[in-house]
């Protein structure tokens, strides 16, 4: 999907491999292919242009735990609270599906400091860090928010 590719490329955060994964997930999800339980939420402007999206889903073999796999807003539209609104609406959908907790993973690299702050400001807390997970010096940080 060109729209999702444009969004994730514009952020400057994702590798070529990650961009391909994002596009494949949305393509498969929207075509009706069975690819587990990936769900999507898109934010559009009044003309129908997609400005950002989330990809989330129930974590298999858990009771009420969900992963937020992707959240991205086109760089032309960042700073307008679109990401915050997408996150809040995604949490609402998760809560309505019986969700209890939302988990988010991100990189420890300096590039991701704004992302880490975004999650903290949204009420998530750091649950764990997996040292050198992505590569030497690039750890995985896992955030969680317990929904009420």
Located regions from the model:
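Acetyl-CoA-dependent GNAT
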Residues: 1-69, 74-76, 84-89, 93, ...
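Short secondary-structure boundary/hinge segments and terminal tails
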Residues: 26, 112, 136-138
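Short glycine/serine/proline-enriched coil/turn segments at secondary-structure junctions
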Residues: 60-63, 110-111, 133-135
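Active-site-proximal loop/turn and secondary-structure-junction residues that shape catalytic pockets
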Residues: 72, 108-110
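Conserved G/P- and acidic residue-centered "switch" motifs that form tight phosphate/ATP-binding loops
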Residues: 81
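Conserved GNAT acetyl-CoA-binding A-motif
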Residues: 94-107
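Conserved catalytic-core motifs of GNAT/GCN5-like acyltransferases
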Residues: 105-108, 120-141
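Helix-turn-helix
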Residues: 115
